[in-house]
Amino acid sequence: MRNPVPRIAAIHDMSGFGRTSLTVAIPILSCMGIQVCPMPTAVLSTHTVEFTDYTLCDLTPELGGILDHWERLGLHFDGVYSGFMASPEQMDSAARCIRNCLAP
């Protein structure tokens, strides 16, 4: 049985300052009646457009474990939303999520 509430995986960063990233995507998509399941790619002190000496905590090493857990739970998503990727390897994690976690 499918979840009656649309569910998406949101693969994106979390910026501490600035109206960007998961801080914006989660409330907007939630107001649209969508269950947002974040897979954070990085935590930044600010967004990267206006600021240059921001801090960045790359979460690439965590993404595989997140996906392993989601797959063990049998989670499926109606869509995958992606944003800022902190490393090229994160594209592989996004592709894996699309391949293995999209609802049939």
Predicted regions: what they are:
Residues 2-18, 24-104:
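Ribokinase/PfkB-type carbohydrate-kinase core domain
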